[in-house]
């Protein structure tokens, strides 16, 4: 499948980014080189990397693809990003989702490489290598699915309205923010402050709906480049995003408008 995807991407004149951003145990590191060789073979343009061991192998063996530093739940510092750019050769970095705009807009003054910002989709807030769901099932003698398609949620005891998506795979347990992110109405501000690398996360937005949402953000980007992205245009495109978003999931602007003192 990845080989076919690479073919389609390159035929369309686009660049292929492949996620290699797991935190690697030694057994995974022992198997990483054949996978990196395959990515080189299919002419991957970028890989996302969250483990120092992968950076080491990529640089040691001289692979041609570029690297994007992606330990996104932990990346909140410009100096941290610059370190990976300088020492590991990262060409870009993925920012954490928990950075208020007041702090975010200070970062370009220090950043030496581009930073990617999530503008739509589920926001990961915690990752554990442990099989937390399976451990819970074992303790409670429950036999149930752990995958994303099971659509499981966590709720805080003090807040029954909370609903943190959770699933488990062979990389561990993944937990996501209460609501999904939608920064359609904030795109002009992001561009004005130098954030032009955007990510759309389609993990919980299946099929064609995600494709249509991506097209709306592409339309917004084109309007911004032409100087035609008005407040009304942003509102109209935002309404279209909300129509296409899964009905059982809510949207907000995440930490974007938070007071930085509330996050520390």
List each model region and its residues.
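Active-site pocket-lining/capping segments in soluble small-molecule metabolic enzymes
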Residues: 1-73, 94, 100-264
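Internal, well-ordered domain-core segments that constitute the primary functional module
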Residues: 81-101
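Conserved nucleotide-cofactor-binding alpha/beta core module
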Residues: 77-79
């Amino acid at each position: 499948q990845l080989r076919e995807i690479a073919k389609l991407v390159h035929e369309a004149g686009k660049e292929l980014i492949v996620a290699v951003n797991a935190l690697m145990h030694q057994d995974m590191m022992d198997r990483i080189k054949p996978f990196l060789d395959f990515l080189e073979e299919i002419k991957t343009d970028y890989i996302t990397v969250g483990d120092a061991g992968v950076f080491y192998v990529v640089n040691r063996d001289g692979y041609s693809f570029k690297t994007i530093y992606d330990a996104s739940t932990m990346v909140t510092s410009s100096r941290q990003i610059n370190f990976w750019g300088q020492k590991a050769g990262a060409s870009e970095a993925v920012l954490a989702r928990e950075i208020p705009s007041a702090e975010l807009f200070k970062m370009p003054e220090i950043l030496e490489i581009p930073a990617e910002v999530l503008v739509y989709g589920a926001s990961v807030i915690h990752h554990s290598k442990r099989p937390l769901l399976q451990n819970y099932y074992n303790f409670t003698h429950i036999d149930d699915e752990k995958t994303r398609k099971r659509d499981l949620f966590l709720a805080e005891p003090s807040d029954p309205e909370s609903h943190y998506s959770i699933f488990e795979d062979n990389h561990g347990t993944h937990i996501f923010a209460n609501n999904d992110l939608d920064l359609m109405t904030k795109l002009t501000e992001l561009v004005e402050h130098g954030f032009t690398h955007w990510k759309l996360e389609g993990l919980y937005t299946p099929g064609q709906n995600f494709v249509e949402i991506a097209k709306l953000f592409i339309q917004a980007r084109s309007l911004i480049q032409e100087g035609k992205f008005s407040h009304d245009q942003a509102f109209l495109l935002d309404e279209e995003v909300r129509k296409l978003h899964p009905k059982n999931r809510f949207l907000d602007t995440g930490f974007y408008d938070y007071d930085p003192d509330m996050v520390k």
